[in-house]
From Swiss-Prot:
Its main location: cytoplasm. GO terms for biological process: proteolysis. This is Xaa-Pro dipeptidyl-peptidase. It comes from Streptococcus pneumoniae serotype 4 (strain ATCC BAA-334 / TIGR4). GO terms for cellular component: cytoplasm. GO terms for molecular function: aminopeptidase activity; dipeptidyl-peptidase activity; serine-type peptidase activity. The keyword Calcium does not apply. Pfam families: Peptidase_S15, PepX_C, PepX_N. The active site is at S348, D468, H498. SUPFAM superfamilies: alpha/beta-Hydrolases (SSF53474), Galactose-binding domain-like (SSF49785), X-Prolyl dipeptidyl aminopeptidase PepX, N-terminal domain (SSF81761). HAMAP family: Aminopeptidase_S15.
């Protein structure tokens, strides 16, 4: 384990003493260090009647147990303090470590022995081996009462609200959209779990079209075959109009009553970060949105009608929209328990909705935590004039996603009444998708949140993985740079795939978000501020660094690609084409081994480099015909240890999100030997070589100069490493699978790779 502590806040000594005293640690500034440590530990072991016993089973050094040490005349030393501290954090002395000073350096332990009271205070705010901070572990065990009131420690809310005796209710928010054109505003179901409190509380809202269930069968039927010819497009410039949103006004009157009438029973799934905040005094709201089970309307996937309906839930929390008790719309309830302040959470589609919501500039949305979210839907299902698939999901497109999330069809009555209209709406979507050309058009323009990024007022926290080929890093990169300069923005850029990171051992992500939301949503005045970029170092396990920016580097490193011309044959023998199509993983393996139709260029790294931003290929290239698809991957090549893209469980159900509440696995990205690691990749239709909105002819056997930016990333390379650039045509995981007989030729002498460093 390595400690990477970003959540700790330096407080004045009087605040430290006061907070310790409120938790029963009655330490005196004038007492000697040894007496203070003993006083602290006897309170620490509050679950024991006889505190001599737990002291006797800890060690002060290799020859002395802690009780014997306190009974002796020996002085407290730094070595003894560290030895005790590590044991309190769950490490076994003489098993996990033998020399506390060596272990302190190996783990990056954040505490330097000196002022013992401040050391003990920070120790309570440090994560244990099993994932909780020490103070959270003690509170979970009953250190302070579960009194349904707020208690703070180091600028963070503690788990002092019951997670068993909570209010569970359902309301139906009246949206300002009518997606199915029935003349009534769509209703959106809101599932609420909130602690009991005599006052107003903030809300954590997860906008998830998946929450009410998914129609996997219908979605699978809507998948496309990726086999087909790359379209030869007519040259033209793409014209666009400013997206428009037509809102509807509330209709009719409804009796105001005091409480919701529908009780929330079981929910499909909760998000463990939300679970963590519930006993800390934050309401949990789950909203599936229009076109989902128990709501009304069509599934409009990603457009501002869908976003508006989610926004209207925040409006209701602030008294600007109505919520009914049921679908009759006869009775309404107010969110009189809400303080109007909201944060959004969730990954993938959920993080996408956070991005979209932020761009409305809605009042009350204080913070978004957008994890692996889409910033422009074109870049999810298309790339540079090509029809593409999200990584791992060949053949998926917008209509299959709509079928997946239109969970109203899971209710037989809704299916009978509404499926015909839903299918008609889906046909309109299919026509607008334009799978023929892969070009950007008005449909995608209406789902591009970057156009409204200037409206964002909320503080923004992103998480994204360098190995996320589902929602690719370009999404967070573009959103990060499109935000107004005056707002606070932060990015946790890890080396995983399309995954959550709130339960990783190496970083205090939950606690950092607690500090932020306690400040922004509960009004606690602290100077807590996350760094702009928190980056997971790819060269070592469990190592995180603060950076000033993502991209924007002034310097670059250029690699020449060679001296000759090389060709990429597009067509495969039928047997190989069929084999790769059945299992794209086989294609990826053979591509990395140099066995596919490809140009492979090994580039020695002659000095330490820190890539930060978008690698760019400048290529002199020609096609043997009037079309061309170019794929590129940049690898770090060579057998060595690399961080793996998916977290592994270190210990099962050891993270407590409250008081024995929703126990969670402790995880981390493994660091183990592999033959290579993908650094970045990209795909380009050569007819869109100069601009996404400009389609140009390709003249057979005529040289073209192409600038081709790959996916943004942050990656450290060391002198002696090897980069491998792979250029090829069809990518059997991502692109259309065109097996026509043509080839691309690259003049390597007139081509280069540029890395921003």
């Amino acid at each position: 384990m390595r400690f990477n502590q970003y959540s700790y806040i330096n407080f004045p000594k009087e605040n430290v003493l006061s907070e310790l005293k409120k938790c029963g640690f009655d330490l005196q500034n004038t007492a000697n260090h040894k007496d203070s440590l003993e006083t602290f530990l006897r309170r620490f072991f509050f679950t024991y009647q006889d505190t001599n016993y737990p002291l006797s089973i800890l060690a002060a050094d290799k020859k002395t147990d802690l009780l014997t040490f306190f009974q002796s005349e020996d002085e407290l030393t730094a070595d003894i303090f560290y030895t005790v501290a590590f044991q309190l954090l769950g490490f076994s002395y003489l098993v996990d470590f033998e020399d506390s000073d060596v272990f302190r350096k190996e783990t990056g332990f954040p505490i330097i022995y000196g002022d013992l009271i401040e050391n003990l205070y920070q120790l309570l705010n440090t994560r244990t081996k099993k994932g909780n901070t020490l103070i959270d572990q003690l509170v979970s065990d009953g250190l302070i009462p579960e009194d349904n009131d707020y208690h703070y420690f180091n600028g963070k809310s503690l788990a002092t609200f019951s997670n068993q005796d909570v209010i569970r209710e359902v309301v139906y928010v009246e949206s300002r959209v009518d997606t199915d054109q029935k003349g009534l505003s769509d209703l959106v179901k809101v599932s609420i779990i909130r602690p009991r409190f005599d006052g107003k509380i903030p809300a954590i809202m997860t906008a998830s079209p998946y929450h009410q269930g998914t129609n996997d069968k219908a979605s699978d039927k809507a998948l496309y075959k990726m086999e087909g010819e790359l379209e030869v497009k007519l040259p033209h410039k793409i014209e666009l109009e400013k997206p428009q949103l037509n809102l509807v006004q509330p209709q009719g009157k409804a009796e105001l009553i005091a409480e919701a009438e529908e009780k929330l029973t079981h929910i499909n799934s909760s998000y463990t970060l939300n679970d963590y905040f519930l006993p800390r005094g934050f309401a949990n709201l789950y909203v599936s949105g229009v076109g989902t089970k128990d709501s009304t309307g069509f599934m409009t996937n990603g457009d501002y009608q869908q976003i508006e309906a989610y926004k209207n839930v925040i409006d209701w929390l602030n008294g600007r929209c109505r919520a009914f008790t049921d679908h009759t719309r006869q009775r309404q309830v107010k969110a009189d328990w809400s303080n109007g302040k909201v944060a959004t959470t969730g990954l993938s589609y959920l993080g996408t909705m956070s991005n979209g919501l932020a761009t409305t500039g809605v009042d009350g949305l204080e913070v978004i935590i957008a994890e692996a979210g889409i910033s422009s839907w074109y870049n999810y299902y298309r790339e540079n004039g090509l029809v593409t698939s999200p990584g791992g999901y060949p053949g998926e497109d917008f209509d299959s996603l709509a079928e997946l999330t239109y969970s109203r069809n899971l209710l037989a009555g809704d299916y009978i009444r509404g499926n015909e209209a839903h299918q008609a709406d889906l046909e309109k979507v299919k026509a607008q998708l334009d799978r023929k050309t892969g070009d950007y058009n008005q449909f995608w323009h209406d789902r591009n949140y970057l156009l409204n990024a200037h409206k964002v007022k909320a503080e923004v926290v992103f998480t994204h993985g360098s190995q996320d080929w589902n929602v690719k890093p370009l999404h967070v990169y573009q959103m990060f740079h499109a935000l107004p300069t005056h707002i606070h923005k932060h990015l946790f850029f890890h080396n995983g795939a399309h995954v959550y990171m709130n339960n990783w051992q190496s970083i205090d992500f939950r606690e950092s978000i607690n500090a932020l939301l306690t400040k922004k949503l509960l009004g606690q005045e602290t100077d807590f501020q996350l760094p702009t970029v928190i980056w997971q170092d790819n060269t070592a396990p469990q190592t995180w660094l603060s950076l000033d920016n993502f991209g924007g580097q002034e310097n670059c490193e250029t690699f020449s690609l060679g001296q000759e011309e090389q060709a990429i044959q597009n067509q495969y023998p039928d047997k190989d084409f069929e084999r790769y199509g059945k299992t794209y993983q086989t294609f990826n393996t053979e591509l990395y081994q140099g066995k596919a139709n490809q140009i492979t260029i090994n580039l020695p790294v002659t000095k330490d480099l820190h890539l930060n931003g978008r690698a760019q290929l400048n290529l002199r290239i020609k096609s043997s015909t009037n079309k061309g698809l170019l794929s590129a991957q940049l690898l770090e090549f060579g057998q060595k240890k690399y961080l793996q893209p998916y977290p592994a469980i270190l210990s099962a159900r050891t993270i407590d999100n409250g008081r024995y509440h929703m126990l969670e696995n402790l995880c981390e990205l493994p660091f183990r030997p592999e033959a290579q690691r993908v650094v970045t990749k990209g795909y380009l239709n050569l007819q869109n070589r100069n601009d996404l909105l400009l389609v140009e002819d390709i003249t057979a056997d005529e040289w073209m100069d192409v600038q081709f930016e790959l996916q943004p990333t942050i990656y450290k390379l060391k002198e002696g490493d090897t980069l491998r650039l792979v250029l090829y045509t069809t990518d059997f995981e991502i692109t259309i699978r065109d097996n026509t007989d043509y080839h691309l030729t690259v003049d390597l002498a007139q081509s280069m790779l540029t890395l921003p460093c």
